[in-house]
């Protein structure tokens, strides 16, 4: 596997301590770690995504997905593409805010996503709004919408991801 696989060097293994008690932060870490580790089963178990998602592809473009079948196809394709490229991804949490009210809540996650291919590293300053719903099995992501605010992509990576 070409992922970081929970190595201590990942910023997700030592997140900012002041976010640890915030609503949905533990779940958010699981989401980000699952993407980093290409762990489809864990990711799928935490996401209902009733209304689809808007995600970011390896080139930094918006990727709207409208239903669960599309969601599953997207992540299978994404993880296979990253593995075939020999690429690693990771995330650094820059800011996090959340509100919970009864059976619903939302969080706003500012993070820097990195895509590493060999010696080249692309970074994407990203904001995600996540809608959470309470289920009998705990909190689940009901909607994810990510937008790239800015990016720094070396020319070599831009060619590889286009």
Tell me the role of every PLM-derived stretch.
Residues 101-136, 156-162:
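Exposed beta-sheet edge and beta->alpha loop/turn motif
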